[in-house]
Amino acid sequence: MGLPWYRVHTVVLNDPGRLLSVHIMHTALVAGWAGSMALYELAVFDPSDPVLDPMWRQGMFVIPFMTRLGITNSWGGWSITGGTITNPGIWSYEGVAGAHIVFSGLCFLAAIWHWVYWDLEIFCDERTGKPSLDLPKIFGIHLFLSGVACFGFGAFHVTGLYGPGIWVSDPYGLTGKVQPVNPAWGAEGFDPFVPGGIASHHIAAGTLGILAGLFHLSVRPPQRLYKGLRMGNIETVLSSSIAAVFFAAFVVAGTMWYGSATTPIELFGPTRYQWDQGYFQQEIYRRVGAGLAENLSLSEAWSKIPEKLAFYDYIGNNPAKGGLFRAGSMDNGDGIAVGWLGHPVFRDKEGRELFVRRMPTFFETFPVVLVDGDGIVRADVPFRRAESKYSVEQVGVTVEFYGGELNGVSYSDPATVKKYARRAQLGEIFELDRATLKSDGVFRSSPRGWFTFGHASFALLFFFGHIWHGARTLFRDVFAGIDPDLDAQVEFGAFQKIGDPTTRRQAV
């Protein structure tokens, strides 16, 4: 037939059997990729330190999605929350991966069967004897079935009625675990950070889908609407399906980048806005203040800060710090976190506590500036020593650590003080192992960043696909050269282009 590469899908345009076949094969490829990717990630994943080397630091992409749906155990004897387990059951990470691969194989065989046996009676219109699909009826069936699945997920899986529940955590990503969730039917259900909204929205949307599906199965579309929206044309289905997909892709790009109950920070890493707003820093200072109010010493108060909370308050975990085209996991960038050194408190020779101004997200380098409690600059690391007035040496800055590995250690040597001041720009200070993975020291993004970029990019692409195929199906007659206002009798076959007398064929 000699079709160009971008027109090859026209071979299934009027062939319902093979149209079904290629869609089953597509499902086989998607499920096969998911299962294979899960097995690859499990082969390289190190579950030994869920606090300082969680899945998102290791660049895991499909493991977080399995985990948020209730999978936490491995046939390797480990649990995602740490520790060992003896009986993971069939629905472990490997079990889910295997199920996808088996399903992929079955879909592969089904696709081959439908490609060979394409001319089935079910696709034949008994009135004309030609292949045809009752698209409004198929729409009703699909809407009904997806509504049942949606309702079932919300009413059974999420609520724990028949299923594990979903991953639920506190606002600071410290206590996450899989647990049943009760539907939130009040206004709080519309808060994107309330897990109960996931249950209630799936129940509500599923109910609507079931009712809408039954409606479309029992009511035929009016003739004018059927013709106006080209409901008999398979390209209409393609166009509206693309619209549904690109809309969903834009939505999930937003929920991933800005954060929501569906994208817990324990599984996907923190968002950039938590660094921008000093979210974890404020909570750490609140906890320290509460400790001091209980008559704890500064050292004791800082020692009570969970290492997990301190690790979130580090710029290397900000997904916006990694360039889009820097391949590899976060661990391949700044290294594998080994331990928290503690919180550095800087003081000048007059005893004032100084705070290092933190690096904003979109800076690669930033001046080291130390300010007092009133925001007045008291010390810095100058660019030109000759003009300096606030250098560490001149001001006599010292640093003392509270909590962490260096608890109680203090330094007055200017070179050491400056080293820790530079590192304090990046948030809490951690010891990082760059040797094991030959990490290059250049920040990488987390799976949160990759997911957002991928889905926003494909959503834009699919938006244009929707416009393209929508225009093709609505204006098919115009593109074919048939003018709806043509009142002259057209002799088909007389012209190379229908209705265009300038292209009259020559008589042989």
From Swiss-Prot:
Binds multiple chlorophylls. PSII binds additional chlorophylls, carotenoids and specific lipids. InterPro entries: PS_antenna-like, PS_II_antenna-like_sf, PSII_PsbB. Gene3D superfamilies: Photosystem II CP47 reaction center protein (3.10.680.10). It is a multi-pass membrane protein. It comes from the Eukaryota. GO terms for molecular function: chlorophyll binding; electron transporter, transferring electrons within the cyclic electron transport pathway of photosynthesis activity. This is Photosystem II CP47 reaction center protein. The lineage of its organism: Eukaryota, Viridiplantae, Streptophyta, Embryophyta, Tracheophyta. The gene is psbB.
